């Protein structure tokens, strides 16, 4: 490259030329195939762009230009997500009105984006704070209300004491506010809520049709968290109360040895009203008060010891067998998860097992593991019957060292323990000592105990039969190393050796044998599927096939539940879309569509009140709306909560198709032409918020005929963060922010664009290094 190349002069010239000739202005029809490429639009923070922000924008610009050159009609717009907490918190910090702060920040962002030379059609710019835009956000809310998908709730919600507002579950990370990291509290408050759970199954099923990164789709599946299970009722002895539990494992019902309820459960609240209800009333009051002061993350910390207090004098009745079981209150159970009460089966649940050990509660095994080997020499052979066999598996300890006897078969790749059949009238102890002597020659094995039973279906290649073996897992110890002879047949079949205790689990290579070792190393807890024992008429059946039958037998209900909760859609802040709602006492009155938008009014004090009311509640002239005439005249009150920052971003991609339309959210012909976003680029951190919310709203708009597709974004590409040179996230707080304006001034926009695209894998985080710009500049 010539040393006199003046990037400032050349880049400025062509940017002026593109703007003057409106090179990137997009038409809404034509013979060319269409291509819609989109960035997740930014919220305009006061700090402006740093070099990490344009990474995705550069990628979409490259795709856009490529598609133009390939003959496509390309829509590549840009706008600003300017409502919500980020913009409002910045305005409060700077003691500037949010309107003024946002206008200044948007102007700065546009200037920064323009000098990078992107091919945006700025004539289609949208801004979520523009009344002409949020008129249609309000219109969508009215349609949701009309269809019964928006409702008021007074349930306890997530409350951030620092931001002084309610939060959706998606705005909480590990029990803390996503914006400020303050521990979140639970606070009962009137809220508007959207019934996103009505769309849960569709949100799950349609993920399969999307060309999205696998980890993003998996994040959404986990967040939606669909599970099928049973609601079972446990009557309380001597009372009219019934505790209803939700469980995905009704097959373990006969193994219940206690119940646990959340400290906030209505049953606990009712019991505490009278001292005589509980023998340990004072102890329970103290425990409940302490639990309610803890954050959710503290209560559910897997590393924390499980604590609880028995509700002394309260016994629940197991509907399966009529047994009386104690009831505990424990902080690890959450009132808003499931029913707020759980049946505890310590033999088949790790958390219940730990709690039962702490409080010396009974542990009753009702499921024995069942494993089926498929594939390989020892895989079950189709068409062959199974031959049942009672057998023993021997875990044998060395007489001096922490080593255990293992077997490696020579006819296939099986590795495990000494095993064999139980003959005639033998018990497992006799069979175990005999098998150890026959297969290893060791003569001093002493049977100590049986650890459990493991059932296994496999092909016994030596016997040439499909075997259904019922292994008693026996633990033995050798007194010494004395050995007798081992038959040549045994030597031909297997190799016997010793393995250090820490390496046994790595040595054994079949799931059923690993479970045998787990019985020894970890205790009798088993959380998998298997064969029922001690379960009345269901004994001997496979657990997976009997779940619904057991549920029906005790009058329970088979239900579908979701981890996903309905979307808390209110914020007790100023800077958001006003709700198009009036209140006539307890009656909700929607604002007429012809009166939209309900414009956000100026306010003297826009800082959050912390009282549960937004600053809008102080504007009497705006809040009080007179309707009717004469004797029919009355005053209604406006809704003073505002919508969350996610409202405007849940449909903005549609407005780019038709940004100036004053009669409809989007013209039907234009929507059908542009169809889905073909290529969408943005951060993976939006997987369980924006991307779920936008999919929900899009499906709703499809249902009411506004859009012609069931999904908004056909292909998604996630962007890896560009970190500071020190390896930390770029932040003014760390002093590691790199300003793109300075990079462009020194090296040029093209240099920066090339550098960011070749830093490393696009979807992975990588550290910035200004010195590396030199190669791209050349």
Predicted region positions:
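Conserved oxyanion/phosphate-binding beta-strand-loop segments in alpha/beta enzyme cores
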Residues: 1-38, 68-77, 101-108, 212, ...
């Amino acid at each position: 490259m010539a040393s006199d190349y003046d990037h400032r002069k050349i880049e400025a010239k062509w940017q002026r030329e593109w703007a003057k000739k409106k090179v990137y202005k997009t038409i809404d029809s034509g013979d060319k195939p269409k291509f819609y490429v989109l960035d997740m639009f930014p919220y305009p923070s006061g700090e402006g762009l740093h070099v990490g922000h344009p990474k995705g924008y550069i990628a979409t610009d490259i795709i856009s230009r490529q598609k133009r050159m390939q003959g496509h009609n390309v829509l590549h717009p840009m706008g600003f997500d300017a409502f919500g907490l980020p913009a409002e918190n910045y305005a409060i910090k700077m003691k500037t009105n949010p309107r003024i702060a946002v206008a200044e920040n948007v102007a700065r962002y546009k200037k920064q984006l323009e000098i990078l030379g992107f091919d945006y059609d700025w004539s289609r710019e949208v801004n979520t704070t523009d009344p002409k835009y949020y008129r249609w956000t309000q219109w969508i809310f009215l349609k949701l209300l009309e269809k019964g998908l928006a409702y008021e709730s007074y349930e306890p919600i997530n409350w951030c004491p620092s931001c002084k507002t309610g939060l959706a579950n998606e705005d909480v990370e590990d029990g803390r506010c996503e914006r400020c990291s303050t521990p979140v509290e639970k606070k009962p408050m009137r809220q508007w809520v959207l019934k996103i759970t009505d769309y849960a199954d569709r949100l799950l099923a349609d993920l399969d049709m999307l060309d999205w990164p696998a980890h993003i789709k998996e994040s959404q599946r986990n967040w939606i968290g669909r599970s099928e299970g049973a609601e079972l009722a446990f009557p309380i002895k001597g009372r009219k109360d019934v505790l209803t539990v939700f469980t995905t494992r009704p097959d373990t019902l006969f193994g219940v040895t206690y119940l646990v309820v959340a400290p906030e459960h209505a049953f606990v609240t009712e019991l505490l009203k009278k001292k005589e209800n509980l023998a340990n009333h004072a102890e329970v009051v103290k425990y409940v008060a302490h639990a309610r002061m803890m954050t959710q993350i503290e209560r559910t910390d897997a590393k924390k010891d499980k604590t609880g207090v028995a509700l002394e004098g309260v016994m629940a009745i197991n509907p399966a067998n009529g047994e009386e079981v104690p009831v505990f209150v424990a902080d690890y159970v959450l009132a808003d998860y499931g029913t707020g009460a759980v049946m505890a089966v310590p033999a088949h649940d790790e958390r219940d097992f730990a709690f039962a050990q702490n409080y010396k509660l009974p542990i009753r095994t009702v499921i024995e593991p069942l494993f089926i080997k498929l594939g390989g020499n020892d895989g079950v052979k189709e068409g062959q019957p199974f031959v049942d066999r009672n057998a023993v598996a021997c875990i044998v300890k060395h007489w001096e060292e922490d080593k255990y006897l293992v077997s490696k078969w020579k006819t296939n790749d099986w590795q495990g323990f000494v095993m064999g059949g139980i003959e005639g009238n033998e018990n497992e102890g006799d069979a175990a000592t005999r098998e150890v002597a026959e297969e290893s020659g060791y003569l001093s094995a002493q049977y100590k105990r049986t650890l459990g039973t493991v059932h296994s279906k496999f092909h016994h290649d030596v016997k040439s039969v499909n075997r259904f073996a019922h292994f008693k897992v026996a633990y033995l110890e050798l007194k010494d190393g004395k050995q007798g002879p081992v038959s040549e047949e045994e030597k031909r079949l297997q190799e016997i050796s010793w393995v250090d205790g820490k390496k046994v689990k790595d040595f054994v290579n079949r799931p059923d044998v690993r479970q045998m070792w787990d019985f020894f190393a970890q205790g009798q807890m088993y959380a998998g599927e298997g064969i029922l024992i001690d379960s009345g008429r269901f004994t001997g059946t496979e657990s997976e096939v009997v779940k619904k039958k057991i549920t029906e037998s005790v009058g329970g209900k088979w239900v579908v539940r979701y981890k996903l909760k309905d979307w808390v859609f209110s914020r007790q802040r100023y800077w958001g879309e006003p709700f198009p709602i009036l209140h006539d006492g307890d009656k909700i009155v929607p604002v007429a569509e012809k009166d939209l938008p309900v414009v956000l009014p100026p306010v003297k004090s826009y800082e959050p009140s912390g009282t549960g009311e937004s600053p809008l509640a102080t504007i009497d002239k705006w809040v009080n709306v007179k309707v009717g005439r004469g004797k029919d005249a009355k005053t209604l009150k406006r809704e003073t909560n505002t919508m969350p920052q996610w409202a405007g971003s849940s449909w903005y991609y549609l407005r780019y198709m038709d940004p100036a339309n004053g009669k409809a959210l989007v013209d039907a012909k234009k929507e059908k032409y542009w169809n889905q976003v073909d290529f969408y680029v943005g951060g993976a951190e939006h997987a369980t918020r924006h991307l779920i919310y936008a999919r929900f709203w899009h499906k709703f708009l499809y249902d009411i005929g506004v859009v012609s597709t069931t999904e908004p974004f056909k292909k998604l590409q996630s962007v890896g963060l560009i970190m500071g040179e020190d390896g930390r996230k770029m932040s003014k707080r760390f002093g590691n922010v790199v300003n793109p304006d300075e990079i462009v001034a020194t090296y040029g926009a093209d240099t920066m664009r090339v550098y960011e695209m070749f830093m490393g894998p696009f979807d992975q985080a990588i550290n910035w290094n200004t010195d590396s710009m030199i190669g791209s500049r050349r």
